[in-house]
Every structure is written in structure tokens, then in C-alpha cells.
């Protein structure tokens, strides 16, 4: 009775549920971008569009990392390469695990469907769920008020196979309708597929290299990888300090600033605050994306980031133009024009991703 009071659209045959008031959700790419920008803010350098092609290893130590943009001579290498972690381990002469890719497809529903549910739910106990490879996905009310449905879990030999198949979407909806019968594919506004990077042991590998001493592996990370990321980072930082301290003094940065100023979100402001922003910068008053109410000013803020990715998708993941019902049908040409003007290049040179 309490469950249906909180979530009236849940299956009326539900017999019990577990309430966890400490659970929640974040925007995964927004969080990652925030961490990256804060790292740069504190002195880190990020090399985008840079692929590791090989390594030189001598006497149990990586002496050089060769990339498509030159050669690095690192004191320490952290292998967090996802589905390619075993390749990096092989280059470093420290491979003791294998990655078997596992594809997962999720659907994003229109914001109007967000009113159907306000929590995180995953059905347990059915034959359909017992055959899954992991927790089995679920229904999530996102921080942007959409519903996310999925993912599924399908073994694949292709590490970059992010294709989306109709049968995956159908399977996910069939399973999650057990929880919420009101779910309908008609509310889907987009869908996507990611590839997990599990090991055959189905466990995280967070440890120092076994043969190569200036190496830390952070591999085999899958769900709940996002949840554990802050704790994993603390462990890896401790390992890194321990390894580096053998050759040099290591001290905490006394000027470290853990606060990263974010981009103002005008659609979440009250009228008075929004008017004040527009008065200071008229670009905040020019709405580019009607679905998400994203202004020209917010797009320019994204392009001025210290981790700037001046592409349509780069801007999309920072301030959300193109993430609404029309999926960029209206605003994409304007976003391309703003990027081109910012970079001082022709429209034809602006990339999608």
C-alpha cells in the first residue's frame, strides 16, 4: 500500500519493495565533465583525440608511451582504458586479464513520462530477470526529469559495437513493464548503446602492475562503477603517491580548489534571477533550443570551458541543446553556427562529435 501511494503507476500486483532513502542519481557525463574541469583547474593537462599506440618497457618500468601526437615519458601510467584495458596492459608487458565486451541498450523517454515515476526501480524475481548477466537494468527518473529505461546485457565480440537493435529495446521494455505497465515505446525520444568492460572473473581490477612497477590497473569496471568511482579514485590516488614516492618527494597541492564553478542553468532559475543574468549578458536571453530552453549564452559558456570540445555533441553533453523531444531538429543548425562563429571557421568544418 505504501509503495503504491508513493508510486501509483507501479504494477498493482507488486507484493513488496525495498526502500533506500540514501539512493539517488547523477548525470554521468555531467559528473565526468565536472571532474575533468576541476582537474584542469588544479593543474592537470588533458590531451583529447590522443590514442596510445605503444609503450617502451625496460627493467619492469614504462619508459615511453607513444601516441598519435607524440611520445610521453611518464613517471606513472594508470590503465583506465575500459574495453581496451587489456591492450594497454599488453603494451605495458603486464597483461594478466581479458576483457569480454558486453553491450547494453537504454532508451530515454520524453520528459512528460517522467511524471510516471519518481524513483529508481528494478524488478526482481521473474524468469526474465534471472537470466540477465548483471543487475538487469531498471527504470530511472533522471536528474533532467526524463525516464531512462534499461540497459540490457548482451555479449559481443566487438569492443566498439554501439549499434542499437530493435530487439534490445523490445526486450528491455518487456522486462520493465513488469514494474510499470504504463511504459510505452511511443514515449521514446532517443536510445543509445554502450559497451561494458567486464573481466571473465566479473570483478573490478584495481591494483598495481604485477610485472611493470610504474603501472596501476583500473580495469573490469562495470556497474556499479559510477557509484564506486569516488572511492576507487581515492584508492588509486593512494597507490599513485606510494609508487611515485619511491623516486621523488610527493606533497599535496596546498592550493587545491575542490570547487568547480558550473555553467548557470537558466531554465531552473526564477524569473528575477534569470532577468538579472540576461541584464548582465543579453546572450542568456536568446533561446536556441526550445525543447530544453537553452540559451546562446549557455552554449558560449560551454565553448569557453577549460576542457572545450567544440562539437555539436560536445556542447550537447555540457548544456543539453538537442536533448529534448525534437532531438536537435530545430536547434542543431543554430548550434553549428554558434560553434563556427566562436572558432572562426566555416560551417563545414564543425564536427558532430
Residue ranges: model-predicted function:
Residues 1-48, 54-61, 66, 198-199:
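Flavin (FAD/FMN) cofactor-binding and adjacent substrate-gating region
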Residues 34, 134, 143-144, 155-287, ...:
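C-terminal catalytic lobe of FAD-dependent flavoproteins
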Residues 48-50, 189-190:
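Short loop/edge segments at beta-strand edges and connector loops
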Residues 55-150, 154-163, 174, 183, ...:
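Flavin-dependent oxidoreductases
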Residues 160, 295-306, 329-347:
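Iron-sulfur (Fe-S) cluster-binding segments and ferredoxin-like electron-carrier domains
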Residues 238, 245, 347-353:
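Iron-sulfur (Fe-S) cluster-binding modules
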Residues 289-291, 326, 331:
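Short cysteine clusters
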Amino acid at each position: 500500500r505504501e509503495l503504491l501511494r508513493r508510486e501509483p503507476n507501479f504494477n498493482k500486483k507488486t507484493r513488496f519493495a525495498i526502500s533506500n532513502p540514501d539512493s539517488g542519481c547523477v548525470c554521468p557525463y555531467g559528473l565526468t565533465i565536472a571532474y575533468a574541469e576541476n582537474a584542469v583547474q588544479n593543474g592537470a593537462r588533458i590531451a583529447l583525440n590522443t590514442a596510445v599506440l605503444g609503450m617502451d618497457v625496460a627493467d619492469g618500468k614504462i619508459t615511453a608511451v607513444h601516441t598519435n601526437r607524440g611520445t610521453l615519458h611518464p613517471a606513472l601510467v594508470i590503465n583506465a582504458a575500459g574495453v581496451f584495458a587489456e591492450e594497454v596492459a599488453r603494451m605495458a608487458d603486464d597483461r594478466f586479464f581479458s576483457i569480454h565486451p558486453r553491450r547494453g541498450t537504454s532508451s530515454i523517454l520524453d520528459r512528460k513520462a517522467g511524471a510516471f515515476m519518481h524513483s529508481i526501480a528494478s524488478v526482481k524475481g521473474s524468469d526474465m530477470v534471472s537470466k540477465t548477466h548483471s543487475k538487469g537494468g531498471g527504470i530511472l527518473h533522471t536528474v533532467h526529469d526524463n525516464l531512462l529505461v534499461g540497459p540490457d546485457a548482451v555479449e559481443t565480440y566487438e569492443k566498439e559495437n554501439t549499434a542499437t537493435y530493435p530487439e534490445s529495446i523490445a526486450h528491455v521494455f518487456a522486462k520493465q513493464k513488469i514494474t510499470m505497465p504504463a511504459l510505452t515505446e511511443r514515449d521514446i525520444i532517443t536510445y543509445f548503446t554502450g559497451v561494458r568492460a567486464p573481466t571473465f572473473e566479473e570483478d573490478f581490477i584495481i591494483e598495481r602492475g604485477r610485472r611493470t612497477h610504474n603501472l596501476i590497473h583500473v580495469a573490469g569496471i562495470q556497474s556499479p562503477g559510477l557509484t564506486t568511482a569516488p572511492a576507487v579514485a581515492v584508492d588509486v590516488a593512494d597507490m599513485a603517491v606510494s609508487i611515485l614516492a619511491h623516486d621523488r618527494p610527493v606533497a599535496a597541492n596546498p592550493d587545491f580548489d575542490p570547487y568547480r564553478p558550473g555553467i548557470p542553468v537558466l531554465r531552473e532559475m526564477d524569473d528575477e534571477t534569470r532577468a538579472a543574468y540576461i541584464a548582465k549578458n543579453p546572450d542568456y536571453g536568446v533561446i536556441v533550443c526550445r525543447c530544453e530552453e537553452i540559451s546562446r549564452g549557455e552554449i558560449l559558456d560551454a565553448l569557453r570551458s577549460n576542457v572545450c570540445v567544440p562539437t555539436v555533441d560536445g556542447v550537447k553533453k555540457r548544456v543539453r541543446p538537442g536533448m529534448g523531444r525534437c532531438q536537435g531538429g530545430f536547434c542543431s543548425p543554430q548550434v553549428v553556427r554558434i560553434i563556427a562563429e566562436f572558432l572562426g571557421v566555416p560551417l563545414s568544418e564543425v564536427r558532430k562529435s
